[in-house]
Amino acid sequence: MTLSREDTLQWLKNCAAVIAENRETLIELDAAIGDADHGANMDRGFQAVLKKLPEIADKDIGSIFKAVGMALVSTVGGAAGPLYGTFFLQAGALTAGKTELSLPDWSAALEAAVNGVILRGKASPGDKTMLDALLPALEALKKFAESGEGLAPALRASAEAARQGMLATIPLVARKGRASYLGERSAGHQDPGATSSYLLLKAAADTWESSSD
């Protein structure tokens, strides 16, 4: 089984929907340890992506991801814009020319995307950032890709690993970004970036389950 271009476009539409639905939650999470703009910034970015999709719907998946990355860089403020922009730009570079993605393709694209975020943000696991959701998700996906199991359970396991990573940020003391200025006071709060990352990966699992029903 593979993820088609249509699946990819639907995933991006679902990303926009889930970010809009959780806009206020992301704002509240960011208000506790940041500057309260993550929800609004992410919503603005993915609404821009949504408007862009009709123009790029006939492109290959790599070109679609690159266009998404550019849209996010130009419309999402704060640290999230460059980081999520890099995420999609790196995924786009690895999927150039493809009109469908196998599980190994998706795993490799996610790995390139996460590595791009690491290089751009210079964060490490446990720093209380989006990486604390993305890295467990990537490891889960790689295990499924190596074992040759199905795409649907792989995406669901990846989303669940991201959820657990997101929750694991609650007791952490932030070592990156505005939250790090709070020191010990940043503990006890869920990281908004890890939360938005989980939402995007959950949307991927939900999209595939809907398309394969």
Show the residue positions of the predicted features:
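N-terminal loops that bind phosphate or other acidic moieties
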Residues: 1-213
